[in-house]
Amino acid sequence: VSRFERLTVTMISDQAIAFQLYQNRELDEIDLNESTITTITSDPNNEYNSQLCEKRARPSAYAMHFNYQKNNADGTPDVNWNKAIANTAFRQCFYRGLNLKAWFSRYNKINPLKCENDYYTMKGLCYNTQGAEYTTLVAKEMGFDGEAYDGKTMIRLRSNNGDIADLKKQAMDELSAIGVTFPVHAAYHIIAGSTTALDTATVLKQCFTDSFGDDFIVLDIKTYVSS
């Protein structure tokens, strides 16, 4: 026996539209875009403040990969970037200095550092023949095995408190000597027409500014069209 006389399926293309539907009580739960989250969390008296909750994490892990042979739009090699990313000190600036806490807040505004993952897979996915979980083994090799979530500082930034002044100087000196010009531009592509993707990328761009300084590395937000 059918429980409903009519069922409506709504395809939502944008989180701003989803929020409007939530306000009209047409949706029970939604993800929020950056501007809406900021509006709600910045005002303790906002009517939706008490309705915020952590979203259950997806059983997956995401990773950023460097392109060591980047080409320009015309097909010619991006020599400036390719030289920069081949430099060890330059790459270590990402590892030891890029603070992504604000970016993680796009996915978990309440406890952003729960999104931190310094390993290639999510926790609990892989085990060796002795039953040891993969990420615990990697943490030991990286010197992280004594570190735990504290809700304040990313694990990989704790050894130097995110201070990369010496590494930055080293990278800039070494790269300037081989003709690299600054700032180095890092390209980050998002799907065209998505305000959610743009909000998230804009936060990431600010993370680059705060962590590196715009005199060193600048994130360029690029778009692609899904076919």
Which sequence ranges carry the predicted segments?
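Short, well-ordered beta-strand elements
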Residues: 4-10, 182-193, 218-220
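Alpha-helix termini
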Residues: 42-49, 73-80, 171-179, 209-214
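Short helix-loop capping/hinge motifs at secondary-structure junctions, enriched
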Residues: 70-90
